[in-house]
Structures are given as structure tokens and as C-alpha cells.
Amino acid sequence: MMEGLKKRTRKAFGIRKKEKDTDSTGSPDRDGMQPSPHEPPYHSKAECAREGGKKASKKSNGAPNGFYAEIDWERYNSPELDEEGYSIRPEEPGSTKGKHFYSSSESEEEEESHKKFNIKIKPLQSKDVLKNAATVDELKASIGNIALSPSPVRKSPRRSPGAIKRNLSSEEVARPRRSTPTPELTSKKPLDDTLALAPLFGPPLESAFDEQKTEVLLDQPEIWGSGQPINPSMESPKLARPFPTGTPPPLPPKAVPATPPRTGSPLTVATGNDQAATEAKIEKLPSISDLDSIFGPVLSPKSVAVNTEEKWVHFSDASPEHVTPELTPREKVVTPPAASDIPADSPAPGPPGPPGSAGPPGPPGPRHVPSPLNLEEVQKKVAEQTFIKDDYLETLSSPKECGLGQRATPPPPPPPTYRTVVSSPGPGSGSGTGTASGASSPARPATPLVPCSSTTPPPPPPRPPSRPKLPPGKPGVGDVSRPFSPPIHSSSPPPIAPLARAESTSSISSTNSLSAATTPTVENEQPSLVWFDRGKFYLTFEGSSRGPSPLTMGAQDTLPVAAAFTETVNAYFKGADPSKCIVKITGEMVLSFPAGITRHFANNPSPAALTFRVINSSRLEHVLPNPQLLCCDNTQNDANTKEFWVNMPNLMTHLKKVSEQKPQATYYNVDMLKYQVSAQGIQSTPLNLAVNWRCEPGSTDLRIDYKYNTDAMTTAVALNNVQFLVPIDGGVTKLQAVLPPAVWNAEQQRILWKIPDISQKSENGGVGSLLARFQLSEGPSKPSPLVVQFTSEGSTLSGCDIELVGAGYRFSLIKKRFAAGKYLADN
């Protein structure tokens, strides 16, 4: 049979006839394709198919003789019929495979022919698969169309679509033809998809990262704003000669020694575009109400209302001689739902004490010094940070002054950023936004401040490290209560203590930790314990030895309690004159309880009274205990120690309420004390500053001198993440010299220096200078205030410490930190 195949010399697409074995006209049985090895010779009706195959107009593929490029699919869908109505067989191989409708007298010959055919085709098939991978896909698509196309006439059982699809796949590989139109190859789709989706989803991620980078450290995103990078070519070229050229800028005598440029800690130059977020938030930042001559009054009450992230309850530092009316709008604006939680039968707060006569923290002179600052300019040009501890404790003489003013002002809702992860933001989380409130929540009654004594049983044995969970029914140890604390079974239920903020307690688990972009954790000695953000500290217990998990203990175990002192220093430096430095330091002490303590209190309704003593308190002034939770003995003779005990019924009620509102919480932070530290001018600032400007029409020279001051701290600790930000106006066209390297934001016209840490171990003992020269097109520049930010942990500026008195509780952690509030320096 193969003899007839070799007689054909015509080629189709360069393929020899012997490769196209099904195109012979001399063998009717091979008109279309090789028969199946099981296919017998055709008789009766099959003869019509052979006769029809010999006619030039009836080729099996619907094309004239010698043309084998395209298949006439219409012919397959509507096959020709013979005189009796049978369709003429198209001579396709395998179409009747497995269907024996005829005799098998020639089955052996057909099988042998098929074997020879397979021997010849297999190498061609593998070769063509490699060369014509796309053609295979096209043919598969075409065959699929055949299988899905219904025939309008009676189908022949020999034309099974499955058989055609199954047997033609290998045959079509050996017979490459001009394919019918098919969709685009998939190899082109990735590029096309990228181009099509680019306008919808924006540029690729790489370009987004190239265009958006944070300009400053993540501690204060709203201060510096988010930024965009600057090309290295835009960076100011360094001069070959030392800066400044010629005579350095004249500096007045100063307490801060001028030293050579600090180059020990160069910073990576990367700029940012932080205009939108920064300007929007600057408009919302409330200013501190004291030091009005320096920082100015609140510009817009509505801006305070919009800024939900800063709507904390503050202590008011308004003295009777000037109760700032700026706080009144804040009272009207902040109306969280916590007010509804206060029962109507709560005891009335104690009567307000006589007006205090204490003076402001700083020297009285600065009150009358004309302010060199324009607050609007400061808030619009300088990215300020809100430090919420700056509004309270200025002249209150006693905790009783927190009187009735706070009843009308419920605590504000928590900021969305910390609602699920923070329990009690630190220094900024003062209490009631009322005019003269030292409490941390409205309607917080004043507990009688009467001295009392109590006898406490010997302390129980220490809890084993394994923390076995004992039966809850066992009696508690140290079941002592203060005689002046309201009994648990009082006729009127104890008032609910929402404390400072509605979110005063919340989950602090590491799984839902804050995002690094807004509230990073400053890790030093114990990671993830306390983090600082916008002038506030936040306390967690991740990393502490015995407090990271919910409480599981028996009735005889001592309850773990953690404490955190967080302080904020606000300072204003005028030139290099130390006598003009105004300083204000505020702080707060927070206690944190594990969530499991509520179950312990439920099983032990009369727990031991929690008593603690604040030591080294001689530098504290205007100490304001939480009047709803704390009792204080004011008759103590020791001026360096203050003892407090907790109103346990109120504490239990508050913790139970919070546990119901926030069942996911792991720890509950409770504000206990607010205080102000007696400041001694520039000696109380951990970082002394002096700024000098030399403004000319064509250029501006800026020099910033700083000095690390160990005398301001009880324990010398490093200042971390120090940032210096200065706006420069006048149309800066070029940075001629910057030492050490800094970040220049061309759009915001601001320069930023970042120093990882400053301490005694730094170059020159923490003394250094920052220098910059700017070429101007619209000079001269107008001097702008310098804004400085830093954090520090491991010490406080007040030197306070805490210790427990009595049994039943133990401190699992005591944390101390401080940070810069409004830390400004002017020319």
C-alpha cells in the first residue's frame, strides 16, 4: 500500500509526499487518512465512499486535489450523502476505532500498515511537536470546535467526535497545515495584561516604592509626614572646602559650646513628600494652653474636633487667674459614648478646693516676654507633634480641684489606631477635658482622703513559675480592705470608672500590634514593652518575664501588676540665652492588670487592697491621683514619699465592665496618677539647643548646636531617634553644604537631620553642630523655629519610683520612659 504513497511528488508547504501519506489519489482507501488497524475493508455502502473519494471534487477534506492547506469544516459538519442517504465516509483514521461494523478479513493487513505508518510518524511527530508547539494548540482548538459543532444531518456512527479528537491529535502533528484563525497565543498575555491593568491599578509595585518613601522615622508620621524620594542628583553637592566658607555665622555667647560639625553618625539622604498628610494634621493639632506667650492659644476648636487621634482627655493646667477659654470648645466637641456608662447614683465629687496659687512651671518672666513666634506660621510650616500632657497640672493646688467641671465632659473616644491594641496611652491620656479636671474620666467622685491604717497578714509564699491553676474556690490571702473604701455590698452600687478614655483598657497582644508606620516600638532593653507615639507612651507586657500571658493563677498566688512612668518634656529655647529657656515636664503613672484578674476577683469578692508608695516624689508638684480609684494619705510627714491605696470595689467594677466591652483584651491599663515635675530651666532639659540664622538675599546660613545634658536625668540614658526639622523659605534652589548629611524636602522646603542616638558615648560626649547653607531665589529667608523630637527609655526626668506596700500583689514590670513634647528652638 505504501507504493502508491511514494508516487506522489507534489509538496504541500515543503513537505514531501511520503510524509503526507494521506494525500494519495491512487489509493482510494488512503484518500483522507490511514484506516484504523481494526477497520475492515469497505463493502456495500462503503464502496460509495471509495468511489466518491476518487472524484476530484469530493476530496475527504473538502479541498481540490493537491491543496491540503485548510480543512473545509463545513463539509465535515454537513457531509455529502450518497444515493441511499448515507454520508460518504471522509476516510479519517481511528473514526471507527473500537467499532466493528464490518468484517475483519483485512484487519491484519490494516494493522501492519498502521504499524508501518506509526514507525514513520513517531519521529516526525516528536520533531514537529518541538517545532510547531503553537500549531498543536491551534489544532486542538480547531478539533474542539469540531467536537462541539452539532451536525444538521444524521450522524454516522463512525464519526465519533471523541474519536476524531483523540486520533487526529497525533495525525495533525505530523501534517502541519495552515491553521484557522485562533486567539492570541498565551505567551503574549502577560505583557498585554500588564499594559491593560496599569491604568487601572497604577504602576508596578517597584515604582510605587521608588516614589513613596517615609521621610522620617516612624515614631512621628504625622509630624514629618509621608514622603517621596529625591534623586541623588538633587542632593546638594558637598563643597570641597569646609563649610562655611569664609567667616562662620556669628553666634552670640551661649551655654552650648560650638563644636566642629558632627559627622560621627551620617544619615542616609532620602527625602519625602509629606505635604498633604502633614499639613492636614498640623491644622488639627491643639496647642498647649500654658506657655501661651510661646506657643499661642488654640487656633481653631474645630480642628481639635476633627483630629480624633488626639481627642484624649487632658488635665487642665489653667490657673484660676487665667482659665483658658480655649478648652471650652474642646469640651463641647468631645462627646464619647462613655458618658452613658456612668450611673446616675454615683457619689458626687468632692467640693473643689480653694483656688491654687501655684505659679507656672517656668520662670514667671517669660509670661511677659513678647513671643517671637507666629503660631500660624509654626503650625503651617513646622511639623509639630501633639503632646497631650502639656495641658494639665499647671496651677492646681490639690486633687480636689478636679471638682464638678468634669461632670459635663465625657471622655473622648479612643483614636482608631489604638482602639484594639492600646489600653492606656501614656502622658497624653490625661483625664477629663474639663477646665480644671485632674481626674481621668467624668463624674469621677473624689474618694475621702482620710488617713487610715490597716493590718495585713504575712505575705503568701511566692507563686511557682509553673503557674498552676488552683481551684477558684480557695480563699484569698491578704483579704484586707481600707476602712474608708466603700464596702462592696453598699446600698448604692459603686460608680463605674471609665477612666480617662473609653479605650483606657484594651488588648495589647502582639498579634494585633500596631503598624510600624504609625506607632513603632522603640526597642532597647526589653522589646515591645512600651512604645511612644505623639507624645504618649503605651504599655505592653510582651517580653516581661512573668506577665505576657493572661492570668492563670490560684487564689493564694500574688497578683501580677505592672507599672509605667511616662514623662513628656516641653521646652522652648530662645537664642543662646539659658535664662530664656522655658521648660515644662509632665508625667503619668499607669498600672496594668492582666485580663484574668477579673475572674480572680469574681471568685474572691473581697481581695486585698492594692497599696503602693511613690518614692522620690519631692520634685513632683500638682500630683493628681485618680479620684475614683485612688485614696491618698496627705498627713504623711515624709515629703519624699507618697502612699496611695486603690478603691478595690471601684477597680473591680471598672475592670469587669471593660472585660465585657473588650473580651479580646489581654491587659487592662488604668491611669492612676498625673503629675507635673518641678523644672529648673535649661538644667532640666535633656538636650540643650541653640540656633543661629544668617539670612542674606542670596543665601541663608543655618547653624544648630546641641548638647546632651546628663544632669537632667536621674540615670544617664541615651536619647533615641533624635530628629531636627527646620522649614526654610525664600525659594531654596540649592543646598550648598550640609553637615552632617540631611534630608531635604524640596516640595515642603524643609530640612531634616536624623541622628540615631545621642549620649555620653557619642562623639564629643554628645555635643555637636548641624550646619547648612541654602542658595535662594527669593531671599532673604525668615527664621523659623526648630522642632526636635526624641525618645528615651530606662529613666525619668523626675526620678520617681514605685514600690508595693502590703501583700497579695507583686510588680512584674516597672517601666520608665520620657520623650520630647513641643521641643522648639528659635533664633
From Swiss-Prot:
Interacts with proteins essential or regulating the formation of functional clathrin-coated pits. Interacts with CANX. Interacts with AP2A1. Interacts with EPS15. Interacts with SH3GL3. Interacts with AMPH. Interacts with ITSN1 (via SH3 domains). Interacts with and REPS1. The modification Phosphothreonine is found at T180, T182, T247, T259, T324, T328, T335, T409. It comes from the Eukaryota. Residues 558-826 form the MHD domain. Signal peptide: none annotated. Residues 560-566, 592-594, 666-669, 812-817 are annotated as: Interaction with DPF motifs-containing proteins. This is SH3-containing GRB2-like protein 3-interacting protein 1. Keywords: Coated pit, Endocytosis, Membrane, Phosphoprotein. Specifically expressed in brain (at protein level). Residues 1-115, 142-205, 223-278, 314-523 are annotated as: Disordered. Residues 336-345, 436-455, 481-491, 498-521 have a biased composition (Low complexity). The keyword Hydrolase does not apply. GO terms for cellular component: AP-2 adaptor complex; clathrin-coated pit; clathrin-coated vesicle; cytoplasm; plasma membrane; presynapse; terminal bouton. It comes from Rattus norvegicus. It is found in: Membrane, Clathrin-coated pit. Residues 245-260, 346-369, 456-474 have a biased composition (Pro residues).
